[in-house]
Amino acid sequence: MSRGESASLACLDANVFLAVLIPEATRAPKEEIAGAERVLRALEEGRLRGISTAILLGEVRYVYLRENKSGFEIARAALEAEANLRILPITVPLAIHAAELRRSYYSKKNAFSYNDGLYLATGLAEHADLIITTDPHLLGVTELKSILPSQYRQK
């Protein structure tokens, strides 16, 4: 990245973090786990700026509980301390927009969840350049460029 150029702003889905934190609990293939590691390294080094919604912490906590793993408080502290990651609260406008996005995308063939809507609404509200996810429902959105972690390449 050259001087004066700012790092891309990516909305990060919980599955990107979970692929690194608890790789054995993910259904993501190995190349997506390696891609998630690259994404998080770029975030730590400031080559990528990240945003997410507070639901991130709930999703991460749930997987720690489901997998009967310890270490959530350490993971939470690391996420909250990451200088290049902003975790946004779920505001009323964000919650409403997420519901509208869910209504727009959900069908019997596309189980677009309310959480999916929150990630997309967050990315749109913050004018993110892209969303990084392994979720096929988010990969199909049209309002924001969405990529798999393995597709992330630093500019």
Regions found by a protein language model. Give the residues of each.
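A generic structural signal for short hydrophobic patches within well-formed alpha-helices
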Residues: 17, 57, 95, 138-139
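Short, well-structured N-terminal submotif of metal-dependent ribonuclease cores
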Residues: 1-52, 64-75, 136
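Residues that scaffold the ATP/ADP-binding catalytic core of kinase and kinase-like folds
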Residues: 19-21, 63, 98, 141, ...
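Conserved glycosyltransferase catalytic-site signature
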Residues: 14, 54, 113-117
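Active-site-proximal, substrate-binding regions of enzyme catalytic domains
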Residues: 33, 37-40, 55-96, 100
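Conserved beta-strand segments of alpha/beta enzyme cores
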Residues: 49, 84-86, 145
